[in-house]
Amino acid sequence: PIPGAPKENTIMKTVLDAVALVGGENCSPNIVGVAVGGFGLDYTENLARKAIYREPLNSRHEDPQVAALEEKLFTAINNLGIGPIGVGGETTCLGLHMEIAGCHSAVFPIAVTFYCWSARYSRARIYQEGKVEFITHPELKEVIAHG
């Protein structure tokens, strides 16, 4: 989809090498953000972070070629067998989202970032009197109530 982009196998190898390198040290299973392209690595890293937050989890990119690559990467990561916290298993990756950007063909950055399980979020409204209303996970009301 991007003129001058690296071949799909280069992107696959880069992402899989990054996942294998960190193994379970990043509190897997993770959500993986991947960005390809951009005008500098800082931009590409931010784009990868943005990809992590796409909702809903595992929604695919609107470009069918990118969506197909997201699916291939997701499957390939889980086939590495790293598993939760690196002890082995089928679930290393809970989700993978990819973003792309144009860039000069002489420089083509690829960024991979991980969203650790402990960084997952919930939206809540905390009232002055101390009441907590969980917006994204209403079932947490029971956890708070029984402390």
Which residue ranges define each predicted feature?
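Non-transmembrane, aqueous-exposed alpha-helical and coiled segments at domain scale
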Residues: 1-147
